[in-house]
Amino acid sequence: MYCPFCSAQDTKVIDSRLVADGVQIRRRRECLSCTERFTTFETAELVMPRLVKTDGTRQPFDEAKLRAGMLRALEKRPVSMEDLEAAISRICHRLRATGERELPARELGEFVMEELQQLDDVAYVRFASVYRSFQDISEFSAEVDRLKKAGGKPGDKLGEPKES
């Protein structure tokens, strides 16, 4: 690695530590020429799979687009940004874990719906209504009924009165 101070090529690693929950390595280095010290961070370059849409077109995975879609579903809902970011991280991990170079976009949609259902039922129904193209109120009602029957998750459930 080149020294950022004198551009010499020879440096030595003095210290290495895992940071960012083990997904990054922080290295403390020293230049063998000028003896200046500097820090570098090392992360694995992970390639996300391309998404194959229903019309057959392919597009690269876009985390910003994922975040925007989830934020739209979660608008004015009591879900923290930390919980949203954790859900996005889990979705990205699941996409990488498939090991595939290409995935159907509907698979990403299913991952998103699973995460939203854990975060907030209202956000889940909002997303599902667009994702599954609900045509009328009966489809909304059927999805809400299915959620009520599933139950078991603490937090904001559909159909339950709000506490004041």
Curated annotation (Swiss-Prot):
<dbReference type="GO" id="GO:0008270">
    <property type="term" value="F:zinc ion binding"/>
</dbReference>
<dbReference type="InterPro" id="IPR055173">
    <property type="entry name" value="NrdR-like_N"/>
</dbReference>
<feature type="domain" description="ATP-cone">
    <location>
        <begin position="49"/>
        <end position="139"/>
    </location>
</feature>
<keyword id="KW-0479">Metal-binding</keyword>
<keyword id="KW-0863">Zinc-finger</keyword>
<dbReference type="Pfam" id="PF22811">
    <property type="entry name" value="Zn_ribbon_NrdR"/>
</dbReference>
<dbReference type="InterPro" id="IPR003796">
    <property type="entry name" value="RNR_NrdR-like"/>
</dbReference>
<dbReference type="GO" id="GO:0005524">
    <property type="term" value="F:ATP binding"/>
</dbReference>
<dbReference type="GO" id="GO:0045892">
    <property type="term" value="P:negative regulation of DNA-templated transcription"/>
</dbReference>
<keyword id="KW-0547">Nucleotide-binding</keyword>
<keyword id="KW-0238">DNA-binding</keyword>
<feature type="zinc finger region">
    <location>
        <begin position="3"/>
        <end position="34"/>
    </location>
</feature>
<dbReference type="InterPro" id="IPR005144">
    <property type="entry name" value="ATP-cone_dom"/>
</dbReference>
<dbReference type="Pfam" id="PF03477">
    <property type="entry name" value="ATP-cone"/>
</dbReference>
<keyword id="KW-0805">Transcription regulation</keyword>
<keyword id="KW-0067">ATP-binding</keyword>
<protein>
    <recommendedName>
        <fullName>Transcriptional repressor NrdR</fullName>
    </recommendedName>
</protein>
<keyword id="KW-0862">Zinc</keyword>
<dbReference type="GO" id="GO:0003677">
    <property type="term" value="F:DNA binding"/>
</dbReference>
<keyword id="KW-0804">Transcription</keyword>
<comment type="function">
    <text>Negatively regulates transcription of bacterial ribonucleotide reductase nrd genes and operons by binding to NrdR-boxes.</text>
</comment>
<comment type="similarity">
    <text>Belongs to the NrdR family.</text>
</comment>
<keyword id="KW-0678">Repressor</keyword>
